[in-house]
Design a protein with these regions (language model features):
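Hydrophobic alpha-helical membrane-insertion segments, chiefly the h-region
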Residues: 14-25
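Acidic, metal/ion-coordinating pockets
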Residues: 24-281
Length: 281
């Protein structure tokens, strides 16, 4: 991991009504200094309304989520906050089936996401329909292990993107799960794909050593187990933000990469009930 961007031990899965977090003792003295805040969510699945809990309380919802994001941007400075979605923002409620997935794009735009990756359910209505929807999206879409260049869809998807936040140059690579078992073969068989480990190593090396990024993030939709395997087969990745398995991680998990370095992995459950928050100094 590049030492100029150390992942601070302040990892929280956050209920919208309040933010909880802690600074590890080793770096507690740095908590008052401005730095990069990463907010991440995954597998929202067209859930726009709060979930009713057994005790009668409400959890999640896009209005509450947007309010939480805005509160963090006000507190930390919008220029210091990176907001990402790890895929499957589509499918899972009548909003998607009745409105053809347009509302999901409107919500992503209104909330001001900086970058998203694709999940398998983004393809439920086909390649051409996904292209139509993404043409209205205001942020980069990253996916490195599929080749969409022969489709209209290819205009809206790149293997990686580079952003500047909190004075740091940040490279974000997208990795999508094997679609052959989760998407109709009439769709999947039209899309060439690459080995996920090879393309991750290729672009991570490029972002680290050619673009001189301070931080290299893999934004994935391959599941928690897939994230661990990805880390163990790659290098030059500083952080993995995952989705697909709906795994609720209330703390960072770590896996060693090819160089024997611990790489943190995070994921924030599903349905927009929680956001993850990461502080980088």
């Amino acid at each position: 991991m590049k030492k100029s961007a150390t992942i601070l031990m302040i990892i929280s899965i956050i209920f919208f009504a309040f933010a909880i977090g802690f600074c590890g003792a080793r770096l507690a003295k740095d908590c008052g200094r401005p730095g990069l805040t990463i907010l991440h969510v995954n597998d929202t699945h067209s859930h726009f309304e709060p979930v009713l809990l057994e005790e009668g309380n409400l959890l999640g919802g896009v209005v509450e989520g947007a309010a939480f994001v805005d509160s963090v941007r006000r507190k930390d400075g919008a220029e210091n906050v990176l907001l990402v979605h790890a895929g499957d923002f589509s499918q899972g409620s009548s909003y998607f089936t009745e409105l053809n997935g347009d509302l999901e794009i409107d919500v992503l735009n209104a909330t001001g996401y900086d970058v998203v990756t694709l999940g398998n359910h983004e393809f439920d209505n086909g390649i051409e329909e996904l292209a139509r929807r993404l043409s209205s999206l205001n942020c980069p879409v990253v996916c490195a292990n599929y080749d969409f260049s022969t489709f209209e869809l290819g205009k809206y998807i790149t293997p990686y993107t580079i952003l500047e936040k909190a004075g740091k140059k940040i490279g974000v690579i997208g990795v999508l799960t094997d679609l052959r078992s989760v998407v109709d073969r009439s769709i999947v068989d039209r899309i060439p794909f690459f080995d996920a480990y090879e393309v991750t190593n290729k672009w991570a090396d490029y972002l680290r050593n050619t673009e001189k990024c301070d931080l290299v993030i893999c934004l994935t939709h391959i599941g928690y187990g897939g994230d661990r395997k990805l880390v163990s087969n790659t290098r030059n990745v500083d952080l993995v933000i995952g989705g697909h398995s709906h795994t609720f991680l209330d703390k960072m998990e770590y896996e060693k990469n090819l160089d024997g370095e611990d790489v943190p992995i995070v994921q924030a459950g599903c349905w927009g009930e929680y956001f993850g928050q990461i502080k980088v100094k």
